[in-house]
Amino acid sequence: LIELGLDYATQPIRTRTLDMEDPTFLALHPRGKIPILEDGGLEVSESPAIVTYLSETYGGDATQLIPNTPWARAKYFEWMSFISMELDATSLYVLRRHVDLHETYGEAPAANDTAREYFLRMIQSAVPALPSEGNFLLGNDFSGADILMISCLNFSDRYDFTLPSEITAYRERVSARPTYQAALEANNP
């Protein structure tokens, strides 16, 4: 939202709290998942869908977060899928459930070890896919894929991963952007 210069209001809801069981929240999002975006009379959930919707609805030439050419657009969706499935769902979400939320989901040391190993293997596999020119996942143009990647990298901090130097350098470039700093401040007052 900050990246696109949009005004917005948030309603913080912490995961696996009573807020997520509130009938008003469940009426809005029956799956009981966060994040969810309300825009006018529309509701959109799941981070990749939210980023894509916002970019396609509000992105202009200077703030377009999704490329327009078929090849670049395919690479965008390739990164979005990789980040969502391989980094987040397959590894970080397992750790979140069985480390952070073990009281709810139970302890699973073998699953945790496998998830850690998988995350490291997948993040290492991302290194050769980084463009040789430019600061971002799609080269010179910052995109919605960078938003998802930096979110996953930030979330991975709680598990003390040692990231490849190329990923650390990428992260530093994205983190130095003024809109990133503004979003970080807005989300962590």
Where are these regions (language model features)?
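GST-like domain detector, emphasizing the conserved glutathione-binding G-site
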Residues: I2-A110
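Active-site-flanking alpha-helical
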Residues: S55, C152-L153, L184
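Phosphate-coordinating loops and pocket residues in cytosolic domains that bind phosphorylated ligands
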Residues: E21, A27, M149, A176, ...
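Conserved beta-strand edge residues that scaffold enzyme active sites
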Residues: T15-R16, Y170, N188
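GST-like fold's C-terminal all-alpha helical module
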Residues: W79, I83-A176
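Charged/polar, low-hydrophobicity segments characteristic of intrinsically disordered regions
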Residues: F119, P178-P189
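Short, hydrophobic secondary-structure boundary micro-motifs
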Residues: A62-N68, T90-Y93, N135-N140, Q181-A186
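Structured helix-beta-strand junction loops
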Residues: R31, D61, S132-E133, R177
